Amino acid sequence: MSEEWVPKTQLGKLVASGQIKTMGEALRSKLPLKEYEIVDYLLPNLKDEVIDIKRAQRMTDSGRRMTYSITVVVGNGDGYVGLGIGRSKEAAPAIRKALINAKLNIMEIRRGCGSWECGCGRAHTLPFLVQGKSGSVRITLKPAPRGVGLAVGDVARTILSIAGIEDAWGFAAGHTKTTVNYALAVYNALKETSKVRINPGIVLSTPIYSGSVVNVSGHKD
């Protein structure tokens, strides 16, 4: 843990004291995540990627001023992903704000082998079809068998990969060139993997994994 971080929230104090040991436990605690350092501590191998940079000029009394709006995705490549937007007069502070917001928006997703063509039981794809939307953009993500890869657009591929999805089919509609809405639609679709209720009495043909997993073979995806 960083020596500079002094937890200020109840969740932060529980993490610092070792009472909460995983990101999954932190999210399931229902306590608000307001300190990005919690994510840094519980997911030390988190990766980040800038997926959109927008620059806008506006006239002021002192002349033209540039404003940056930057979108960043973070993930551990194993069941956790977050998306954030940051705005500032300069690029570096905007990226930092976006990175912090992405960490505060971290979520746990479900994975599995939802493709009837595969049935390997590993956490390589989506457990079932999910849909997401943002603005005019609508996206559908479908499970795919091992080896297909990510048959989606570049932005969706970046988000799915950093979330730990290796194989998927995707179909998008609307103004998909609006990168921010496209990214948010993908993020919202992944959020649906954890919202679907699964009847505990149903016997699943393949396992469904939440968050970071170790496959049945004993090897981590």
UniProtKB/Swiss-Prot annotation:
InterPro entries, per the entry: Ribosomal_Su5_D2-typ_SF (IPR020568), Ribosomal_uS5 (IPR000851), Ribosomal_uS5_arc (IPR047866), Ribosomal_uS5_C (IPR005324), Ribosomal_uS5_euk/arc (IPR005711), Ribosomal_uS5_N (IPR013810), Ribosomal_uS5_N_CS (IPR018192), Ribsml_uS5_D2-typ_fold_subgr (IPR014721)
Cellular component terms per the entry's GO annotation: cytosolic small ribosomal subunit
GO molecular function: rRNA binding; structural constituent of ribosome
Keyword line: Ribonucleoprotein, Ribosomal protein, RNA-binding, rRNA-binding
An individual GO BP term: translation
PROSITE patterns, alphabetized: RIBOSOMAL_S5 (PS00585), S5_DSRBD (PS50881)
Family, similarity comment: Belongs to the universal ribosomal protein uS5 family.
Function of the protein: With S4 and S12 plays an important role in translational accuracy.
Assembly behavior: Part of the 30S ribosomal subunit. Contacts protein S4.
The record's note on its domains: The N-terminal domain interacts with the head of the 30S subunit; the C-terminal domain interacts with the body and contacts protein S4. The interaction surface between S4 and S5 is involved in control of translational fidelity.
Protein name in UniProt: Small ribosomal subunit protein uS5
Native organism: Thermoplasma acidophilum (strain ATCC 25905 / DSM 1728 / JCM 9062 / NBRC 15155 / AMRC-C165)
Organismal lineage: Archaea, Methanobacteriati, Thermoplasmatota, Thermoplasmata, Thermoplasmatales
